């Protein structure tokens, strides 16, 4: 019995760690939004790192609020093919101080039938006003 339990648990852990979003239905696409804090790099190779502060940030697709960054990072959502606008807005309890994460950001994507697109949206910390 313990051997069976151990095998079941290891299978569950492997499935959780190596997760890939399911393929979209025919004629549709799947978009996964990966929210991160932009800490440097170049436009071609941004250095974008996970930040737990972004978990509650709202994700808007084509102007409609569609959940939070935490909701979108695993399986994303099924969308129609074509061009879409992604916006990520951080909830503010108070004004941002210099260096605090993050300023709202966005991205444009074009989805194709059968595609699973993982789109990174990098949000910057508030810069100094110098």
What is each stretch, according to the model?
Residues 17-130:
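Short loop/turn and low-complexity linker motifs enriched in small/turn-promoting residues
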Residues 1-15:
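Sec-dependent bacterial lipoprotein signal peptides
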């Amino acid at each position: 019995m313990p051997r069976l339990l151990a095998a079941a648990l290891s299978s569950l852990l492997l499935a959780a760690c190596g997760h890939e979003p399911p393929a979209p239905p025919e004629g549709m696409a799947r978009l996964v939004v990966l929210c991160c804090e932009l800490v440097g790099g170049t436009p071609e190779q941004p250095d974008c790192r996970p930040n737990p502060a972004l978990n509650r940030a709202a994700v808007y697709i084509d102007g409609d609020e569609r959940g939070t960054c935490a909701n979108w990072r695993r399986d994303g959502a099924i969308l129609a093919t074509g061009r879409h606008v992604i916006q990520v807005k951080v909830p503010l309890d108070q004004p941002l101080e210099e260096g605090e994460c993050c300023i709202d950001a966005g991205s444009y994507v074009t989805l194709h039938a059968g595609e699973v697109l993982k789109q990174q949206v990098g949000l910057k910390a508030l810069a100094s006003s110098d």
